[in-house]
Amino acid sequence: MPRITQEISYNCDYGDNTFNLAIDIGGTLAKVVFSPIHSNRLMFYTIETEKIDKFMELLHSIIKEHNNGCYRMTHIIATGGGAFKFYDLLYENFPQIKGISRFEEMEGLIHGLDFFIHEIPDEVFTYNDQDGERIIPTSSGTMDSKAIYPYLLVNIGSGVSILKVTEPNNFSRVGGSSLGGGTLWGLLSLITGAQTYDQMLDWAQEGDNSSVDMLVGDIYGTDYNKIGLKSSAIASSFGKVFQNRMTSNKSLENNENKLYSSHESIEKNNGQMFKNPDICKSLLFAISNNIGQIAYLQAKINNIQNIYFGGSYTRGHLTTMNTLSYAINFWSQGSKQAFFLKHEGYLGAMGAFLSASRHSSTKKTST
């Protein structure tokens, strides 16, 4: 089943009554944004990219339900890597379509983010565990538009792309990382056997990383005030795993004659002492802290204060957002700010949708 995100009320431009279906097919997730003709509603669906056949079925069901099955008046705009990888598959599945076009991925991300920043109330917010969620007014309201630029977009999907935006339509990719959502999802599915990303996030929310990570307090016994580190700060992600393994191995070597009566202890010493929720929280912290520090460094290099986090990595997950916010605040000593969005995973698809609305007469292409 697709994951449905809250719809938005917006006065869309329906042009010549073409039903625009904007899709963003990434390495992990496939997203779709559309607006039923004359509904003034934006709707958002997501499904795993590995279920690409189900995604094609989803697009068919959307056309049938929201455009009366009228394929000849339906235009698909594709962005993301899948716009190239699955381009032929799209044509095979939609031979009667009015048009299928591709939209440049990075441009789509920026157009989508600018739209959410300027046009959608209650979309952009800050978050940390102490202050909670704080909504940022749209620039068309009380926020000064000049205060928005320049900014960094840290788009976290399967990997991470960092874009510097100096003004509308003026941006450049300044960095990135291969350690992103795909890394978290891949390693946790391998280690814990979790079946879905949401399950991993649920486990992480209830986990205790202190049983897995080596903390500053484990080394110093207290805070390390000289460099501003609390005892709860992570000194080494997964640092206790190797330490406990070494202790377990020595215990087994010294008690070989007792193995026959210690089955439960053997299982525990072979790794069962580490609970899945604790492992999930530890790795979530490791990946998020790494992304946060890279984002801060790029913001420092480019002299930028505002950092927007997009992509499907956060999913409104409180621990993830708090970790990213903490990293930005800690490394910048409070001089830079992390921002989040309610529809963070749909920036590319939203940008593609807007491009079609502005050019609703696009013809069928074969490029």
Swiss-Prot record:
Keywords (A to Z) from UniProt: ATP-binding, Coenzyme A biosynthesis, Cytoplasm, Kinase, Nucleotide-binding, Nucleus, Transferase
Reactions catalysed according to its record: (R)-pantothenate + ATP = (R)-4'-phosphopantothenate + ADP + H(+)
Location of this chain's protein in the cell: Cytoplasm; Nucleus
Disulfide bonding pattern of the chain: none
Pathway terms, separated by semicolons: Cofactor biosynthesis; coenzyme A biosynthesis; CoA from (R)-pantothenate: step 1/5
Activity regulation details: Regulated by feedback inhibition by malonyl-CoA.
Enzyme Commission identifier(s): 2.7.1.33
Signal peptide: none
Domain of life, source organism: Eukaryota
GO CC, one annotated term: cytoplasm
GO molecular function: ATP binding; pantothenate kinase activity
InterPro entries recorded: ATPase_NBD, Type_II_PanK
Top-level EC class: transferase
GO BP of this protein: coenzyme A biosynthetic process; ergosterol metabolic process
Misc: Present with 6190 molecules/cell in log phase SD medium.
Physiological role: Plays a role in the physiological regulation of the intracellular CoA concentration.
Family classification: Belongs to the type II pantothenate kinase family.
UniProt name for this protein: Pantothenate kinase CAB1
Gene: CAB1
